[in-house]
């Protein structure tokens, strides 16, 4: 009779995927010329979209996995000094499960008697912008260039955070053209990793070890 149960996490694979997409976007930008084929430009855009979505998915999966590890009392995450936190996170899970990503992180900090991230802090603002960009791509709604709302707001939030796509016509729309370049892809990966690292340090839990042959390099 089988007595061993196996529980597989995905968050670290999502981080590796995001970094791979960013590296591939960088490689295409180094190769591209003004005469580059539409096929290459399509690949480049796909890598950038993948990096954004996978970076946000890493944050989403990581916090979900943490709550479920609390329920399971995973000893590698919740040692003897964190049993109170594990019990509180277990109790909170059904309430918080469907809430936005950042709310889950902030709530975990509160349960651990740690100060939540100030909403005006750079790292919080960056992740909020990343999640909003991910949502805009996943739940995409086109907007007329004379009636920009969500896309205009995103450009204002993101416009100076990274270099714009060097392969895009500067007169084209911010989303999906000027925004989605290696600058955006790399920023997405680094934003997600930095936030998660700061979160675990703040909460006093061990950070996840991400085994990646390229060391999560973004170019």
Model-derived features: where do they sit?
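Charged alpha-helical initiation segments
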Residues: 1-49, 217
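C-terminal/domain-terminus segments
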Residues: 2-9, 78-79, 147-165, 200-219
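Alpha-helix boundary/N-cap detector
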Residues: 5, 9-12, 16, 96, ...
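Amphipathic alpha-helices that form helix-helix packing interfaces
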Residues: 18-21, 25-28, 51, 55-59, ...
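Hydrophobic packing residues in well-ordered alpha-helices of helical domains and bundles
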Residues: 44, 51, 127-130, 185
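Short, hydrophobic, well-ordered secondary-structure elements
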Residues: 44-70, 138
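Flexible secondary-structure boundary motifs
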Residues: 71-159, 163-174
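A hydrophobic membrane-anchoring alpha-helix module
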Residues: 134, 174-219
